[in-house]
Design a protein with these regions (language model features):
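ABC-type nucleotide-binding domain
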Residues: 324-572
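Helix-loop-helix
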Residues: 47-51, 60, 146-161, 167, ...
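Pre-NBD coupling/linker segments of ABC/ABC-like ATPases
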Residues: 313-326
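Transmembrane helix-loop-helix hairpins at lipid-water interfaces of multipass membrane proteins
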Residues: 8, 14-71, 75, 148-153, ...
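An intracellular "coupling" helix at the cytosolic face of ABC transporter transmembrane type-1 domains
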Residues: 9-11, 75-76, 97-101, 117-126, ...
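Hydrophobic alpha-helical transmembrane segments of ABC transporter permease domains
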Residues: 19, 23, 27-31, 56, ...
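Juxtamembrane helix-loop junctions of ABC transporter transmembrane domains
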Residues: 19-20, 27-40, 61-108, 112, ...
Length: 572
């Protein structure tokens, strides 16, 4: 079992937990024997001192049993929490190796649920294994053994009852197991809906769509509740059936033992001991039933957790080159084709981008602009064709090396909680001169300087304490601070006014050593680019200067005319 690899690291604490629980169970097995002795010798002979001695023995058994149980609980908690912590660390590390294709399959809400809820279920199973699965078998086998020592014939009643209960428990476990897998998947759906609602709460309110979203959420929670009720009904059969079998066995024992008491082959105390041992078996089986319920949930969680741990990045890091030196033909696409699942997005793209060149990319929605630049850092691998950077195939570079030389600013601004300085300096330690240049080029210097704490100003989660334009400028500053050889700006100036956008484009032109790729919906934002790439349904239909495209490229002409006519109407 794969989980044993984690438990082995804590085998010392787990073993001690097992041992102390067995010690407690052994003491518990002694109680019926002492009670039988009290009845037969103490009460039977009216020996008060013997009864008091036995009473002290029972108190001693109880105290030591309590202490052993406490030690077991401590070691069980230590082991289960340690295993859970290590699982979470390994999962988090593995998730951070995932590429975009992995995250398309294992969604963020599902990963969060697995990282938290599923690991908790495994922790509980580990703790219960140490605390209960050591005690219950020992108690049951020990009770059967002690019962055989008292009366071999009556003990057969114990054996038959235990077999019936074991078969019943196993059957109910097999029937209920699929329900827990479905319940965990439904929890993923609920988490996904909740996350979407929390992220898009303003949009939902703006369109008065709360009722629809509430219905969506209620539908999935009802489905989850229905599955819980179904499995609850199945498992509810277990305890009553267990009590029925055990109590029926006790009645038979009392009835059958009456004859043996009459003929003197069995004492009254031994009958009481047999009943107590039957009750011990009942307790052990109830514990088994509860543990099996926990194991059912943990099995589903175990599969989901190890799916995360065993899912390898689809983009394999098998490159050998650890350095990247810019050359004249900085980026080359050679007959590149790509698609998501069954949908083709890019078709037979071939082009070259020179070192230090500023290239714009424009096209309609779904043209493949963002997809194209995502291939540069191997967020996805191509279906066919090759991409070369600095004279080598991108697959031949170490992933860390390749990504170190490419800096992205994505459409959706992503700022983490902390300070402006911490957000911008994510790629390397703080250097004042590089920071000032990054803020100046990104047009963020003025508004950051006006903040009372400057670059030490706090950033709340998602950068919600800044406007959309300010967030975009900070993410551009972060990308510039990296000083990568290739800078990709993916429609990241949409929230900037025209004057700020124009100033940004002018400053970017001054970065002569950096190869820049700018995606935008505005032709005005791309006018200064050395060349502009025009995509139409994943095909390259134009790649030239702004002026030349206006003459030769129909798609670019239509985009330009539609934007300028709108601006003209607005100005008019």
């Amino acid at each position: 079992m794969k989980l044993l690899k984690y438990a082995k690291e804590y085998k010392f604490s787990a073993t001690l937990g097992f041992l102390f629980k067995i010690f407690e169970a052994a003491l518990e097995l002694c109680v019926p024997v002492v009670m039988a002795s009290v009845i037969d010798k103490g009460i039977g002979n009216n020996d008060t001192s013997y009864i008091l001695k036995c009473g002290l023995v029972l108190i001693g058994l109880a105290v030591f049993g309590y202490l052993f149980a406490l030690v077991c609980q401590w070691y069980a908690s230590l082991t289960s929490q340690s295993v859970g912590t290590q699982l979470r660390k390994d999962m988090y590390h593995q998730i951070n190796t995932y590429d975009d294709a992995n995250l398309d399959t294992l969604t963020a809400p599902s990963l969060v649920t697995r990282l938290i809820n599923d690991v908790v279920q495994i922790q509980l199973a580990v703790a219960m294994t140490i605390r209960l699965t050591s005690r219950a078998p020992f108690l049951m086998i020990g009770s059967l053994f002690m019962a055989f020592m008292i009366s071999g014939s009556l003990s057969m009643i114990f054996v038959v009852g235990a077999i019936i209960l074991a078969v019943s428990m196993f059957s109910i476990t097999i029937i209920s197991m699929p329900y827990f897998s479905r319940i965990q998947k439904l929890l993923d759906k609920i988490a996904l809906i909740a996350r979407e609602n929390l992220k898009g709460v303003r949009v939902i309110r703006a369109f008065s769509n709360q009722n629809h979203e509430i219905k969506r959420f209620n539908k999935e929670t009802k489905n989850q509740k229905d599955e819980q009720v179904k499995v609850g009904k199945i498992q509810a059969l277990l305890n009553p059936f267990t009590y029925l079998i055990v109590n029926f066995a006790i009645i038979i024992i009392i009835y059958a033992s009456g004859f043996q008491v009459n003929v003197g082959s069995l004492s009254q105390g031994e009958v009481i001991a047999l009943v107590n041992y039957m009750n011990s078996i009942l307790q052990a089986l109830i514990v088994f039933a509860n543990v099996l319920s926990i194991y059912n949930k943990a099995t589903a969680s175990y599969q989901r957790v190890f799916e995360v741990l065993e899912t390898k990045p689809k983009v394999e890091d098998q490159g050998v080159y650890e350095t990247l030196t810019p050359i004249e033909n900085m980026i080359e696409f050679k007959n590149v084709n790509f698609g998501y699942l069954q949908k083709d997005v890019l078709h037979d793209l071939s082009f070259t981008i020179k070192k230090g060149e500023t290239v714009g990319i424009i096209g309609g929605t779904g043209a493949g602009k963002s997809t194209l630049v995502s291939l540069l850092g191997r967020n996805y691998d191509t279906r066919s064709g090759e991409i070369w950077i600095a004279g080598k195939r991108i697959e031949d570079y170490k992933l860390a090396t390749l990504r170190k030389h490419i800096s992205y600013v994505l459409q959706n601004t992503s700022l983490i909680s902390g300070t402006i300085k911490e957000n911008i300096c994510m790629s390397k330690p703080y250097q004042a001169d590089i920071m000032n240049q990054a803020l100046e080029v990104s047009q963020a210097k003025e508004f950051v300087s006006n903040l009372s704490k400057g670059i030490e100003s706090p950033v709340v989660q998602g950068g919600k304490n800044f406007s959309g334009g300010q967030r975009q400028r900070l993410t551009i500053a972060r990308a510039l601070y990296k000083q990568a050889d290739i800078l990709v700006l993916d429609d990241c100036s949409s929230a900037l006014d025209y004057a700020t956008d124009a100033a940004l484009q002018k400053q970017l032109q001054e970065l002569k050593e950096m190869t820049k790729i700018i995606i935008s919906q505005r032709t005005a934002s791309l006018k200064r680019c050395d060349r502009i790439m025009v995509l139409y349904h994943g095909e390259l239909v134009g790649f030239d200067s702004h002026e030349q495209l206006l003459k030769d490229c129909q798609v670019y002409q239509e985009i330009y005319e539609s934007q300028n006519s709108k601006e003209g109407e607005t100005n008019g």
